C-alpha cells in the first residue's frame, strides 16, 4: 500500500518545506520518523498497535488520545446497551472485535496520525512538541481510565433507571 503522505500533495509539500521543524518537534527518533514519512509504503507502528494511548501520550498527542478514549467509551456504552437489550453472547464478541479493529487501525495509521498531529501543531506555532514521559500518564488517563469511568458512570445510571 502506498504512503498516504506521498499520495496527498499538500502533505508532501508540507513535509518537504518543514523537514527541520519536523525533526525538532519529533525530538527522539527524528530521523526514523522522517524516513517513515518519506518512505514509499506505510509501516505498522507496533507501539501504537499494542500501547496506543500510552504511545500517543508519550508523543504528546493528547487531543488524539482523547478521541481514541471517546471511541473506547462509546464501544463500552454499546456493549452495555447490548447487555440490557439482548440476551445473546454475540454482543461481547462483536464489541471485542470492534476494540481489536480500533487497535489495528491505530497501529496501521499511527504514523500518519502522528504526522497529521505534527503538521497541525507546527502550523499552529506550538513550540513545545516532542516526547514526554509524564505524557504516558496523561495517555493512560485519557485513553484508558477516562473511558472506563465514563462507561462505568453510564452503567450505574442505566441500572438505576431500570430498577423497578
Model-found features: residue ranges?
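Membrane interfacial helix-start motif at the N-side
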Residues: 25-67
